[in-house]
């Protein structure tokens, strides 16, 4: 049984991800981290889901049972956990969140002592420990060695300072009217505080979490309400975050929702113009062809990697780069953060607007993405794509029609993601029907 998906362990809270799994997974991770332990402390944070209480208590129980001390910091963005794990010199960090998923899902993400997401090799080792009953039992400590847990409520200030330090000292947000949609999620306190302290006029939406409304018709996956509000209030820009604030969606002053690749492109160019861009930009295999064309036109190389911000970061490290991201809104400025951080990306885009003295729409309009269609098809089984009869011929036929393709399985669900890209939207719509029918027959028998 495989526990880890593309971004930690994730599933329906109380069913797949119940308190038993959370406790045992925490024990397994703790056993792994013990080998390199320095402080014997592990940091635990969460988003605003009600199930976070259940999972947090289970994780604390598991870690303390093997002798670890636990620092609980409550609702906090995922990138804050990455930063604070290193800043507070913990052996590891744990974030309880299902990111952009509905409230009934939850997840567990791990960070090493340096605030990095774990490699697949380390995740595999933790899985092996999880299923090793003898090792789990043998790792329980005597009563006098059981760890302690303490809750700290004032660490938010450390993260706010680090975020503000990413914003240019010679700029101020005083001239900007900004609408923030915090998705009833982990950034509901932090995001408004940062923008207000830097001088912006701030209007906040979806900032009243009740444990069940996270991401519900709001945030990065549902920016329509934000778009309407930006237009109604004649704001300069709108920023939508997801439940754990590791991704960003931008809405311009006209109420248009920006394409994630357009955002990547203009931010990369901004870094280059400042002399701060190192090596090539990294995006995922789902990036729009227009992004590569835009970057190449400005003398910037683009490398691609698998979907997932941890793979973007791995590629950046390998290339010696410092900027990359995903079309979905995970944007990594590795000079400032170890993972995608929606707040940092929002501040950098604000700085770009201010330094250029241009509107959001005129900046984002520099990159004109090609039409793409994405279909998430539910399937009965995940067959090896290389062994599906007729698939090679289908891809060749689409290629001959100047259609780019990407077919890949979801890492967490029984889905195949079907992506087509071309300059002709009508052609895409026609061919997508054929592609869907092909995979229905191939994977649903």
Swiss-Prot record:
It catalyses: alpha-D-glucosamine 1-phosphate = D-glucosamine 6-phosphate. The modification Phosphoserine is found at residue 99. Keywords: Isomerase, Magnesium, Metal-binding, Phosphoprotein. Disulfide bonds: none annotated. Pfam families: PGM_PMM_I, PGM_PMM_II, PGM_PMM_III, PGM_PMM_IV. Activated by phosphorylation. GO terms for biological process: carbohydrate metabolic process; peptidoglycan biosynthetic process; UDP-N-acetylglucosamine biosynthetic process. The active site is at residue 99. One of its GO terms (molecular function) is phosphoglucosamine mutase activity. CDD domains: GlmM (cd05802). The keyword Methyltransferase does not apply. Binds 1 Mg(2+) ion per subunit. Its EC number is 5.4.2.10. InterPro entries: A-D-PHexomutase_a/b/a-I, A-D-PHexomutase_a/b/a-I/II/III, A-D-PHexomutase_a/b/a-II, A-D-PHexomutase_a/b/a-III, A-D-PHexomutase_C, A-D-PHexomutase_C_sf, A-D-PHexomutase_CS, Alpha-D-phosphohexomutase_SF. Mg(2+) binds at residues 99, 242, 244, 246. It is an enzyme of class 5 (isomerase). Belongs to the phosphohexose mutase family. This is Phosphoglucosamine mutase. It comes from Campylobacter jejuni subsp. jejuni serotype O:2 (strain ATCC 700819 / NCTC 11168).
């Amino acid at each position: 049984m495989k526990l880890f998906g593309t971004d930690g362990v994730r599933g329906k809270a109380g069913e797949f991800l119940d308190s038993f799994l959370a406790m045992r997974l925490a024990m397994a991770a703790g056993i792994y981290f013990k080998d390199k332990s320095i402080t014997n402390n592990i940091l635990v944070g969460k988003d605003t889901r009600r199930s976070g209480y259940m999972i947090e208590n289970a994780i604390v129980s598991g870690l303390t049972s093997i002798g670890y001390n636990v620092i609980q910091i409550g609702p906090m963005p995922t990138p804050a956990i990455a930063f604070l794990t290193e800043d507070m010199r913990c052996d590891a960090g744990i974030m309880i969140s299902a990111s952009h998923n509905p409230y009934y899902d939850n997840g567990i993400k791990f960070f090493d002592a340096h605030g990095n997401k774990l490699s697949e090799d380390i995740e595999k080792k933790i899985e092996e420990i999880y299923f090793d009953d003898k090792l789990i039992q043998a790792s329980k400590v005597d009563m006098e060695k059981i760890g302690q847990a303490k809750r700290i409520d004032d660490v938010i200030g450390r993260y706010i300072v680090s975020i503000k330090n990413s914003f240019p000292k010679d700029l101020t947000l005083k001239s900007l009217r900004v609408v923030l949609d915090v998705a009833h999620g982990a950034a509901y306190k932090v995001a408004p505080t940062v923008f207000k302290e830097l001088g912006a006029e701030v209007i906040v939406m979806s900032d009243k979490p009740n444990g069940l409304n996270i991401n519900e018709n709001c945030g990065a996956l549902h920016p329509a309400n934000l778009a309407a509000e930006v237009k109604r209030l004649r704001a300069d820009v709108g920023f939508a975050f997801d439940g754990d604030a590791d991704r960003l969606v931008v809405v311009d002053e006209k109420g248009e929702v920006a394409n994630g690749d357009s955002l990547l492109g203009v931010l990369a160019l901004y870094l280059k113009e400042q002399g701060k861009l190192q090596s090539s930009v990294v995006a995922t295999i789902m990036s729009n062809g227009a992004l590569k064309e835009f970057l190449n036109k400005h003398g910037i190389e683009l490398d691609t990697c698998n979907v997932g911000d941890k793979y973007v970061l791995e590629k950046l490290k390998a290339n010696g780069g410092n900027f990359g991201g995903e079309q979905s809104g995970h944007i990594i400025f590795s000079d400032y953060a170890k993972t995608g951080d929606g707040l940092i990306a929002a501040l950098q885009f604000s700085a770009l607007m201010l330094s250029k003295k241009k509107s959001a729409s005129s900046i984002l309009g520099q990159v004109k993405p090609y039409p793409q269609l994405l279909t998430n098809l539910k399937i009965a089984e995940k067959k090896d794509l290389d062994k599906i009869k007729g698939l090679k011929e289908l891809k060749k036929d689409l290629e001959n029609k100047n259609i780019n393709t990407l077919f890949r399985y979801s890492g967490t669900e029984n889905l195949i993601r079907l992506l087509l890209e071309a300059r002709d939207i009508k052609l895409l719509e026609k061919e997508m029907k054929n592609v869907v029918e092909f995979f229905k027959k191939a994977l649903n028998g």
